[in-house]
Design a protein with these regions (language model features):
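Long, charged/polar, soluble alpha-helical segments
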Residues: 1-180
Length: 180
């Protein structure tokens, strides 16, 4: 997949996403917040792409897809599941410094977020299963991304951004407490 195709796919998928819970329900507010993040990052990705900022367009798309997929998993959103989408092509060499910086920043952010968050629900509740899935997804993203470095900064950025989107969605959904 090329960056332009990824951004286009994300925009189309985000545009079709709808709440899976009644708007007036107690869960409706969280569904709206998730969809707002998904929509905002789809818009940001399009603006970045329009201005030739491929690195930020890519990161915004993957991060937003993480939010979207987590929102679907949690049952707040009805949408197509994307999983993390890899690029088949490297970025232009003149963007490597920016790509490297962004990739390493997302790696640090994901590590920090994992270290600085704890499950909010009691381990005996059904919600705890969701916590485990979200943490597992974020930890797997960190591990896979680190294994890709330093050979594949592009797809390492994809998995770091995507995993960070999952974890952020879990935090916003009240499933994690921030400890540090």
């Amino acid at each position: 997949m090329l960056i332009e195709e990824l951004v286009s796919y994300y925009q189309k998928t985000a545009a079709k996403a709808v709440p899976a819970v009644p708007k007036a329900s107690i869960l409706g507010g969280t569904a709206d917040e998730i969809l707002e993040m998904v929509t905002c990052y789809a818009s940001d990705a399009a603006v970045f792409l329009k201005h030739g900022d491929l690195v930020n367009a890519f990161a915004a798309s993957e991060y937003g897809l993480g939010w979207l997929d987590c929102g679907v998993y949690l049952g707040y959103v009805n949408a197509e599941i994307s999983n993390c989408l890899a690029l088949e092509k490297e970025f232009p060499t003149d963007l490597f410094e920016k790509l490297e910086e962004k990739t390493l920043r997302y790696e640090r952010m994901l590590k920090g977020a994992l270290a600085g968050s704890v499950p909010a629900p009691d381990a005996e509740t059904g919600c705890y299963t969701a916590v485990e899935k979200i943490r597992e997804t974020a930890e797997r993203a960190l591990s896979v991304g680190e294994d890709m470095l330093p050979e594949d900064y592009v797809n390492a950025l994809a998995v770091f951004s995507y995993g960070y989107g999952w974890l952020d969605c879990g935090v916003r959904s009240g499933l994690f407490q921030i400890t540090g």
